[in-house]
């Protein structure tokens, strides 16, 4: 709006306008005599990219942020319905730690609308885990992965671990 001078400024309105910015968690605006406004902003801190276009905080809050605000930060890719954000983030933390201990790097974790889990490794291999408890399926993957022989000139696209025992994999031309 228009400039209203020091006394004419509505600090509540300024605060509300600042809080409409998607990455602003909260704002405090105060008048400081004789002619200043004090503005304090609290921003959401992204820990992962959510559904390719948004971000998620460590407590599972989904929010928007211009990609250029990330600078050089490399974040994992997580995905799923917004109400599942905290569950996916917790799964990411567990899977990332478990795999790191086994010298495997996870790039992303997602759950679909039906509750089926999927993990993407840093080499772009997708692990299809299906619904339910994914932990034993990932344990099985860690056991069989070193034994998989990929045909010459091919690369693994995905490994399907939805079976009760064993797995299937799909290899495409590299």
What are these regions, as identified by a protein language model?
Residues 131-174:
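Extracytoplasmic/luminal low-complexity segments enriched in Pro/Gly and acidic/polar residues
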Residues 4-5, 25-26, 35-36, 45-48, ...:
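Short beta-strands and strand-coil junctions in structured, solvent-facing domains, enriched
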